[in-house]
Design a protein with these regions (language model features):
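Cysteine-nucleophile active-site neighborhood
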Residues: 63-140
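A glycine-centered loop/beta-turn motif at secondary-structure junctions
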Residues: 175-211
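N-terminal beta1-alpha1 cap of cysteine-dependent amidohydrolase-like domains
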Residues: 1-83, 199-245
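Beta-strand-turn-beta hairpins that frame and shape the catalytic cleft
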Residues: 2-4, 141-146, 184-189
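Structural motif
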Residues: 55-59, 92, 190-192
Length: 245
């Protein structure tokens, strides 16, 4: 039986917007195909050995402006995560988790927080929150559009070697300026999309699952189809509501 070992980082501190639903989605989509998901939660004080896992998830939490408490992250865990990214382990990082993978975050007061440096991106605080339902398209997903809910003060800018996850059709995405949303580097999927994201974007969910299975087993993976009628109805409803057909 195929199995993915999933590491859920800081579920107690980085789950303000029900981003843990992404873990549930991945787990169920594996089980429905007769595969197994072994989920381990890693929080402050817990030892992290990235070699033990195939897929990593980091969710959204408080803004840096509001005093996010992640001192445990900086140091050994941060170095391990950077190593895992370069080793092409699969990551789904949402909002704060996405920002944490970058080079730095600069607050509205000009305070710079040096971060993981796993992605060549940086984030700066804006004056107003970027908030609301939004929609973007991704070359990896063909004609299927991705919908989510954004709620962030940070403006993220991509550097050399990093591609956007998608192009914004409605909403703000990374910064509200250049129409980019999220980031793709090696096997990292970074995004500002809450929702939770994956339950109403099953094609993206399977893209992430397939990437993790292929990385683990070293061969091309063709996932058996699932009945995604309800999931795609939810997706299409939001696409239509946002005027992105």
């Amino acid at each position: 039986m195929s199995e993915l070992k999933i590491c859920y980082l800081y579920p107690d501190m980085l789950n303000l917007f029900s981003d843990g639903g992404n873990i549930t989605c991945i787990k169920k989509r594996l089980e429905w195909r007769g595969m197994k998901a072994d989920v381990t939660e890693i929080s402050a004080g817990d030892k992290l050995n990235v070699n033990d896992y195939d897929l990593f998830f980091i969710g959204g939490g408080q803004d840096f402006e509001n005093g996010i408490q992640l001192s445990d992250y900086f140091g050994e865990k941060s170095s391990e995560i950077k190593k895992a990214v370069e080793d092409e382990k699969v990551f789904l990082a949402v909002c704060t988790g996405y920002e944490l993978l970058g080079n730095y975050y600069k607050s509205s007061k000009g305070v710079q927080y040096d971060l993981t440096g796993a992605l060549n991106i940086h984030t700066e605080a804006g004056k107003e929150r970027l908030l609301g339902n939004y929609c973007f398209e991704s070359e990896e997903l063909g004609s299927i559009k991705v919908v989510g809910f954004e709620n962030h003060i940070g403006r993220t800018y991509l550097g050399e070697g990093v591609k956007p996850l998608g192009k914004v059709l409605k909403g703000n995405g990374n910064n509200g300026e250049d129409f980019t949303e999220g980031a793709r580097y090696k096997n990292v999927f970074g995004t500002y999309a809450h929702g939770a994201l994956l339950p109403k974007n099953p094609v993206l969910a399977d893209c992430i699952i397939a990437a993790a299975l292929e990385r683990k087993y070293g061969r091309k993976i063709e996932l058996s189809p699932l009945d995604d009628t309800f999931e795609m109805n939810a997706n299409k409803y939001m696409v239509s509501r946002l005027g992105c057909e």
